[in-house]
Every structure is written in structure tokens, then in C-alpha cells.
Amino acid sequence: TKSTTTACCDFCPCTRSIPPQCQCTDVREKCHSACKSCLCTRSFPPQCRCYDITDFCYPSCS
């Protein structure tokens, strides 16, 4: 598994529009470094998800 310093995503659904709208739906202890809109739960360990919408998917983390 890659670290969160490298932007990566295992689950990234995209719309069929042109350009596509993609969103990483991975839930991790923190968001990857390229994430601009990261929301985390207050649980321990935290569960974080990046809510950015891009026109591409990052490489797989695993």
C-alpha cells in the first residue's frame, strides 16, 4: 500500500460524461496529499474521505 503522501485511489467511479467526473471513494486514516476537500470522522482511528471531483483517477494504491 502506498503512503498518503502519494496521491492514489483504489475505488474511483467516474461519470460517462465528457469530460468525466471522477471521485475517489476510498476511506482511510487521512486523505492523500493532492486532496483539497478532505472530511474525517472524529472516531479513532479517523475515517477520512476526499470529496474532490476530478476528470481522472489517480493510480491504484495497492
Swiss-Prot record:
A GO CC term attached to the entry: extracellular region
Coiled-coil annotated residue ranges, if any: none
Record key words, sorted: Disulfide bond, Protease inhibitor, Serine protease inhibitor
Domain of life: Eukaryota
Disulfide bridge partners, by residue number: 8-61, 9-24, 12-57, 14-22, 31-38, 35-50, 40-48
Recorded GO MF terms: serine-type endopeptidase inhibitor activity
Cited InterPro entries: Bowman-Birk_prot_inh (IPR035995), Prot_inh_BBI (IPR000877)
Site (described: Reactive bond for trypsin): 16-17, 42-43
UniProt-listed CDD domains: BBI (cd00023)
Gene3D superfamilies per record: Cysteine Protease (Bromelain) Inhibitor, subunit H
Family: Belongs to the Bowman-Birk serine protease inhibitor family.
Main function: Inhibits trypsin but not chymotrypsin. Inhibits the trypsin-like proteinase activity present in larvae of the crop pests Adoxophyes orana, Hyphantria cunea, Lobesia botrana and Ostrinia nubilalis.
Protein name as annotated: Bowman-Birk type proteinase inhibitor
Organism of origin: Medicago scutellata (Snail medic)
